[in-house]
Amino acid sequence: MCMTDVVIAWVDGDDPAHKRKKAQYLTGKNETKFDDVAGAMRYRSTGEIYYCVASVLRYAPWAREIYIVTDSQDPHVDEFVAHNFPDNTIPIELVDHKVLFRGYEQYLPTFNSLAISTMLWRIPGISDSFLYFND
């Protein structure tokens, strides 16, 4: 039996709540200075989460579990999977940043994928080896 999980970091940058949260931390900052690292293009959601999940389900049926790491958001992949992969047996679980950063809440919110990546090992029940995708 395969013991490899899949982790997908995902954010819906078009979500009004996410935009407000991010703006709260950029207010008063030089916007052009942050365009490269915090510009809207870096957070735009174009449905890539569905392509990623579909690719895993189709080409990695040996995966044990899929974890979608997000900041209080839900990509609603369950409906997509039920419709397109009715025989799917791979569990899909949402993992909030608060779970990853438990004990380090002072560093939240974070909009830095590198900071998030360093905490993936803290996903409860994650396998020793996992594939990491970042939208």
Region spans (language model):
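A general structural motif
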Residues: 1-3, 63, 127-128
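N-proximal low-complexity "stem/linker" segments adjacent to membrane-targeting elements
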Residues: 1-43, 47
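Structural beta-sheet core signal
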Residues: 6-8, 68, 132
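Active-site-proximal specificity loops/subdomain of glycosyltransferases
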Residues: 26-44, 74-127
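Short, acidic, metal-binding catalytic loop of nucleotide-sugar glycosyltransferases
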Residues: 55-63
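Short beta-strand/loop segment that forms part of the nucleotide-sugar
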Residues: 64-73
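Short beta-strand-to-loop acidic/aromatic patch adjacent to the donor-nucleotide binding site
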Residues: 127-135
